[in-house]
Amino acid sequence: VISPVDSATADSRGTPSAVKRALVLLLLVGCNAEGPMREPHPVSVRDELRPTDTSSGEMWRFLPSDTVERYDAPDGGYRVHFTRLAKNAVPATDVNADGTPDLVEAVASVYVEVGAKYHGELGFRRPANDVALASNGGSDRFDIYLVDFAFSADGAFRTDACTGEKCIGYVVQENDFVGYNYPNATVATRILGSHEYFHAVQAAYDNNQGANFSEGTAVWATEHFDPTTNDFEGFLPQFLARPDRSLDTAPTGPVSGYAYGSALFFEFLSQKYGVPIVRKLLERTENGSGHPSEPADAANPRWLVQLDAILKADHQSSFAEAFHTFIYWNFFTGPAADATKSYANGAAYPAPMMTTVAAPYRVDNQRVFYAASAWFQVPAAGRATMGAQLVDDPATAEDETAGMALVIAVRRGGVNSLALPITDVKSAATFDTSGAATLVVAVVNTAREGNAGVLSKRPGLCIGSPDELSACASALRPAPDAGIPDAGVPDAGLPDSGIPDAGTPDAGTADAGIPDSGVTAVDPPKGCGCSTASPALGALLVLASALRRRYAAAN
């Protein structure tokens, strides 16, 4: 069914280009904890504006002169809004001559297919209904608006009303994809629509779980909707390039590819524990619905805490065990892939970023943030036996090896001849490295969160032959120093695996020279991700994420 929609009055201020507006917003307010935040609040007239409200100042909207039409998908609760003339026009091609442009029908069909997958097979909730909003697209159907993005992005989910942390919204997407790097508009919509629509699904549970959860689960959802796209694989290099970053902490600034690439962890969960675990996790993030085993987290749940509870209750496991296994699985990617021990499609995934060091290798304080890891590759250089161990400093009050784990592999010809997860990190674990090219060591912090504001552990690290390990461990266990405690004394900028920390404790938000992987995990401002784009900040997501997705997905 197609029906015209009345055009609104013209914007007397004029409209700068989408790109210029996005850059102006970025310069004025940025996209970090210091910028304006769109907190949950009662519905207001300003919030309820849609792209059809042409005088609204929305970045992506129809022109006052546009005649906007509606097309209702015949077999689903979706409505597509489009126009036939001027810059926002969809392609006029209508092969079946039914009066509706083919692209409009294709968009509607994709959303119907996406909805059937998400709400049928996968069992996720439908997006929150917008029937009570004054500007709701004319019905309670989920709305998709097709407008020209002028290469500022390719689409976004926008929220226009929230109750608590549950939000109502709609999707606005590129009208023709001409000049974009997708094979065609239908493929683009399959990638974009399945991703942005999943943000609407997330918003029906909780819209404030951070960029890694929001973007990671959305990319995961696209992969399960249509694994023939390479959207998922396209983001993995950016995630695996930063194994040292806490799993729930996205880089500062506009949403990055790292957040999208965190989909790998959710794919690991679904392959290891079953696909329903992601839905169960979303259900537990809803305010007031936290797992009963975590009463302190029930009112406003955090996803890592809730995942730990689900794993304990349903799988006799824990986040610590699962994360250790996740790192182990990541040893089997690329040329080292082994589907019997890791991902079904691991051959298509890159290896994590590693630091190449020479044995014997010693680090007095190897900083590893919670839910993160540090990777090393060490040439055997003729050593017949090699291994690694962690060492606690007896002068410190806290055991720096508590909650730590190792994964060690012997690689010959780029393939693991042996790889083992290790929990007894204080004992030297050694392996036959005769004829081996490389020993690969991952140091893993399996904690789900920091402890009393301290976000990392700093054990000593030794890698080498058995004799070298013994000498290293002895050197890292100094004799008592006449009663003078050295816990808390700055380390004068001595490098921890090459990263100077200037002796700054990590109980605060600063890293003292460590890139922002150690910044306290602050919930991102509303609107800094495409899942919660507000009128003030929503467009900023696309400068860092949508264009990246467009090119990564199509190559």
Give residue spans per PLM region:
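Hydrophobic h-region of N-terminal signal peptides that target proteins for export
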Residues: V24-A33, L543-L547
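N-terminal Sec signal peptide cleavage junction
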Residues: C31, C528-C530
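Zymogen propeptides/activation segments of proteases
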Residues: C31-L122, T396-M404, R412-V415, K426-T446, ...
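Acidic/His/Gly-enriched intrinsically disordered linker/tail segments
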Residues: D160-K166, V187, I191, D206-P276, ...
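Beta/coil-rich, acidic/histidine-enriched accessory regions frequently appended to metallopeptidases
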Residues: G290-G483
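C-terminal low-complexity, Ser/Thr- and acidic/Pro-rich disordered "stalk" regions positioned immediately N-terminal
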Residues: P480-G527
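A cross-kingdom C-terminal cell-surface attachment/processing module
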Residues: S534-Y551
